Curated annotation (Swiss-Prot):
This is Lactaldehyde dehydrogenase. GO terms for molecular function: lactaldehyde dehydrogenase (NAD+) activity. Transmembrane segments: none annotated. InterPro entries: Ald_DH/histidinol_DH (IPR016161), Ald_DH_C (IPR016163), Ald_DH_CS_GLU (IPR029510), Ald_DH_N (IPR016162), Aldehyde_DH_dom (IPR015590), ALDH-related_metabolic_enz (IPR051020), Lactaldehyde_DH (IPR053404). Homotetramer. NAD(+) binds at residues 220-225. Pfam families: Aldedh (PF00171). It comes from the Archaea. Pathway: Cofactor biosynthesis; coenzyme F420 biosynthesis. The active site is at residues 240, 274.
């Protein structure tokens, strides 16, 4: 759609407002040959990015942050319309994006190698870019997750082809316009950054297969991640995939705090968050109290128009997604789950649901990606850990306890990429390592760590003459 400094404008794909269901935009869908061309252009410009000084890369990122900051309200509103995210959550996403850009700018100047002692001469290392980064991003955080890939790519001197989700591409288009403006202002050829909109089956597939792409950075579903991993052959990949993230609540914890955390975290962005609470594993002595607090907190939530400042939960990304959640609730109940509150659907809206389940229930095994909070009673921490680890996923886990010995023991036992103690799994800072084990992903994100992933270490040895 934006290739080699030129916009390709067609009306190929309808984009809908998830709340009103109105058609808000028609966008270009690149075919395979156009996608190949976008990648070829990106590849031809990789030397330009490589040769930019660290201070110029820093300046690009800081200028993008500056322009974005001047349009914070516009971008927050666009996120809410594009995704259905409540406006107060969209504003937080914009702020986090600014942090990610500024951190990326910082690391543009911090790229450094090391000197290694040698009796026979000098050994040193230097960091170099990989070349072309294919960034494939999801709908749920269309601005922040894009900059988590674009920022480190630019910081390390890579050229970029960005493929946003076709479900919510509008934010990426406006971000690209800012990048275009900055590159033009700095007299840098616009072909160093290209935007490839369209269907993932074509555009994303070509990016993952194309030999001119040196690394694919993908955030999305396990199924697509596995496909990318197979297609990528020997190219580098980072995959940030899904999870059924457990939150363990022990009897010695602050039960009210745990309940508030579970509700706030589970229903963020209507549950459409990869690190959303998948299930809460509660010791039997306190499960009744915990459940009471959860229902009280859930009743306080306001469901509705994402542009209303009082709204806590907006729509899912589409009516089809909401129907899938409605059917999951029905299946859970048919398997013995007890629906305690919520679960009513109207178009793309689903009222937040709380369900008592057991380990064999469908909700204990999958990533729901919607506003369902399953509660599962356990005898003790050992059973909780066993259930949590009996999963193909391993993204993040939460643990509530006031016993530091329990906390450290369970943190060691849990098979997850991140363990949040006295917090839900839904915790992330933009500079912490982030990623999962098992089928939840490969590699780590977080600006500092993505910079490492997107650069190569070259060793230089100078022998005594």
């Amino acid at each position: 759609m934006f290739i080699d400094g030129k916009w390709i404008i067609r009306e190929d794909i309808d984009v809908f407002d998830p709340y009103t269901l109105e058609n808000i935009e028609k966008i270009t869908a690149l075919d395979r040959e156009e996608t190949k061309n976008a990648i070829e252009v990106t590849e031809k410009h990789k030397e330009i990015m490589k040769n930019l000084s660290p201070s110029k890369r820093y300046k690009i990122l800081m200028k993008v942050a500056e322009h974005l900051s001047s349009k914070k309200d516009f971008f927050a509103k666009t996120i809410s319309i594009d995704v259905g995210k409540p406006i107060k959550q969209s504003k937080i996403e914009v702020d986090r994006t600014l942090t990610a850009l500024k951190l990326s700018a910082f690391y543009a100047k911090e790229l450094r190698g090391e000197t290694i002692n040698s009796e026979n001469g000098l050994i040193f290392t230097k960091k170099e870019p990989l070349g072309v980064i294919g960034a494939i991003t999801p709908f749920n955080f269309p601005l922040n997750l894009a900059t988590h890939k674009i920022g480190p790519a630019i910081a390390t001197g890579n050229s970029v082809v960005l493929h946003p989700s076709s479900k919510a591409p509008i934010v990426a288009i406006y971000l690209t316009k800012i990048i275009e403006h900055v590159l033009k202002q700095m007299d840098i050829p616009r072909g160093v950054f290209n935007l490839a909109t369209g269907n993932g089956e074509i555009v994303g597939d070509e990016i993952s297969k194309n030999d001119n792409v040196n690394m694919v950075s993908f955030t999305g579903s396990v199924e697509v991640g596995e496909s990318i991993s197979k297609n990528a052959k020997m190219k580098k990949v980072t995959l940030e995939l899904g999870g059924n993230n457990p939150m363990i609540v022990l009897k010695d914890s602050d039960i009210k705090l745990a309940a508030k955390s579970a509700v706030k975290s589970k229903f963020l962005n209507a549950g459409q968050v990869c690190i959303s609470v998948g299930q809460v594993l509660v010791e039997e002595e306190v499960v009744e109290t915990f459940t009471k607090y959860v229902i009280e907190e859930t009743k306080k939530l306001i469901l509705g128009n994402p542009l209303d400042k009082n709204t806590d939960i907006g729509p899912l990304i589409s009516p089809e997604s909401a129907l899938r959640i409605e059917n999951l609730i029905k299946q859970s109940v048919s398997e013995g789950g007890e629906l305690l509150i919520g679960g009513n659907r109207q178009n793309s809206l689903i009222s937040p649901a709380v369900i008592n389940i057991d380990e064999e229930n469908i909700l204990s095994k999958i990533e729901t990606f919607g506003p369902i909070l399953p509660i599962l009673t356990v005898k003790d921490s050992e059973e909780a850990v066993n259930i949590a680890n009996n999963s193909k996923y391993g993204l993040q886990a939460g643990l509530f306890t006031n016993n530091i010995n329990n906390a450290m023991k369970i943190a060691d036992e849990l098979e997850y990429g991140g363990i949040m103690i006295n917090s839900s799994p839904t915790f992330r800072k933009d500079n912490m390592p982030f990623g999962g084990v098992k089928k939840s992903g490969l590699g780590r994100e977080g600006i500092k760590y993505t910079v490492e992933e997107m650069s190569e270490t070259k060793t230089v040895v100078i022998h005594n003459i």
